[in-house]
Amino acid sequence: MQRVHQLEPGDVQRLIDAALAEAHVDEAQVSLAVVDGGGHLLGFHRRPGASTASAEAAIAKARMAALTGQDTAAMESAINGERPALLQLATVLGQPAAAMGGGLSLRFADGLVGGIGVSGMTPQRDAAIAAAGAAALPIWPHLEAVSFSCGDAEACAAFFCCQLGFRRLDAIDPGPDYAALVGLPGAQLKLVRLALGQEHLELLEVRELAPGQRPGRPFPSDARSNDLWFQHICIVVRDLNQASAGVREGIASGTIAPISSAPQRLPDWNTAAAGIEAFKFHTPEGHSLELLAFPTGKGDARWHEKSEPGVFLGIDHSAIGISDSNRSCRFYDELLGLRLGGDGVNHGPEQDGLDGLAGTQVRITGHRCPSGAGIECLDYRSPSGGRPMPSDLKAQDRAHGQIRLLVGDHAEQLEELAAQVESYGGQVLSPGVITLPAAAASQLGFRAGLQIADPDGHRLQLVVR
């Protein structure tokens, strides 16, 4: 069963507080209302000096936005333009039309969860106050970063920056609590943090192991795309031929190992993926990467914005090898709150060439966050022989990848997830929820974390701010 998102009391108060903070800037005499997806009132506030009429109008605006899924300013423009019949909605919905600025629909994970209405000032000012409130809507789950374990994080960072357009942010010692979170208590770690577009990549290097901890292992030399430890990041590019030029030179010189036989264009019969161009390869340390160019009409709208500079645009998703699509859908969508963003089977010579396999049939399910990067699950039906995740995989091993997901704003949410992980086929790896000291929390961008494994062993770091 898909998770149905709804506004919680804490969400409602957060929206109202944010709107009130904006109204306080000019002491706006307004009323504020928040309703659920059915138009039922969840929260209300009337500022000093706000009229009785503003109270009724704020509720009407919120209800209209929620029940129609449209912002009331857009409805006003439509009614004044080519669609005056929209006024009949007032009769259909049994409430005032409220076709004036100040009512905004509230969406979460592409679903309508309610509306916020503000009234008492000009329509433009009402709309600005409502927008400040709507901006406080929680944005989780959100993929905060992907992490790869490296033997030499600085050398890996140089590769990503020189070859793939990443920018270096910083290098930090994440501290002992973070080391305990990733399963290496007492070890000395280094995190080199990179960014591409809106997304972040962390390169983890173990500088010194604690007594009794074994050395890290390299990738198996015979690793294949259908092994269950497989994980790549998909880097969206504007032009695949231009973006892959340096990589192809590295392959020719022997410094980079290919996965794909050559850049591939997915066939027209595959409606969901037709026209996508992609190329997979390994970094010098063995991590798997994909360069991908979306044709017009596919992928997030941001990948087609002309204002985005450069050839390398950002990270669309991290793909992971799995053994049971239905089980992984339950884990990622029901438990963690992502949404199913695509489901299909790729096969044929183009997929063989892309994955470096023969006779490929792979079911691909995409799992998306409300915004930003997502997770893609690769369930290879053919060829057989994909090997499971090593049961003793540790953070010092090159095959150790990690996806950090922001899942809330208080530690109790992590406790609730920890209690459910095993029932969805996963495993809690950290010694419970680990709360970071203030300095580490400020440096890392989260204040508490829980380390888990999905049903196939892929590492996830669930965090709250």
Residue ranges and their predicted role:
Residues 1-138:
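Flexible, solvent-exposed loop/hinge segments and secondary-structure transition points
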Residues 44-49, 116-122, 291-297, 381, ...:
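Short beta->alpha transition motifs characteristic of CBS
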Residues 100, 188, 229, 275, ...:
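Exposed loop/turn and edge beta-strand positions of beta-sandwich/beta-sheet ligand-binding modules
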Residues 113, 141-145, 228-232, 315-317, ...:
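Short, solvent-exposed beta-strand edge segments and adjacent coil->beta transition regions
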Residues 138-139, 148, 171, 200-202, ...:
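Vicinal oxygen chelate
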Residues 140-163, 167-237, 241-253, 423:
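An N-terminus-focused feature that recognizes amino-terminal "leader" regions
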Residues 149-200, 271-274, 321-374:
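Core segments of cupin and vicinal oxygen chelate
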Residues 358-359, 375-397:
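Flexible internal linker/loop segments at domain or repeat junctions
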